[in-house]
Amino acid sequence: MNNQTTIGILGSGTWGIALARLLHRNGHDVTVWSRSPKKIENLSATRTHPALPGLVIPETVHFTCDLQTVASGKDILLFAVPSIAIRQTAESARPFIPLIPYIFRVSLRMTWSS
C-alpha cells in the first residue's frame, strides 16, 4: 500500500520549485504546473530553475501545463502563483478541485499599496 501524499503545485517560479523539491525530499509525490509549455519543457529537460542556481530538481518531480493533471486526484493543492494571477488560476482550476481536502495559497511576500 502506498501512503505517499500526492501534492499539486500551481506555479513553477522559485517558490513553487523550492517547495516541490522540499516536499519531494520528504517523501511526497509532487506535480508542478505552469501555464507556459516552454517553461515546463525547459524544467523537464534541465531539471533546474534559472533563478535557483545549484538546485537540482529530482527526476521524479512531475511537470505539466495541464490544470486537470496537476489538480485531479491530489491530496493537497498549493497555489504558488503570483498574487495577480491567483484569481484567474483558481477559476481555471475550479472544475478539477472540488474534492481536494486541503488547498493552500503560499506566498513569499505581500505588497501593500497606499
Predicted ranges, named:
Residues 68:
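Acidic phosphotransfer microenvironment of two-component signaling modules
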Residues 71-72, 76-114:
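Rossmann-like NAD(P)(H) cofactor-binding subdomain of soluble oxidoreductases
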Residues 1-56, 61-65, 91-92:
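NAD(P)+-binding Rossmann beta1-loop-alpha1 motif at the extreme N-terminus of oxidoreductases
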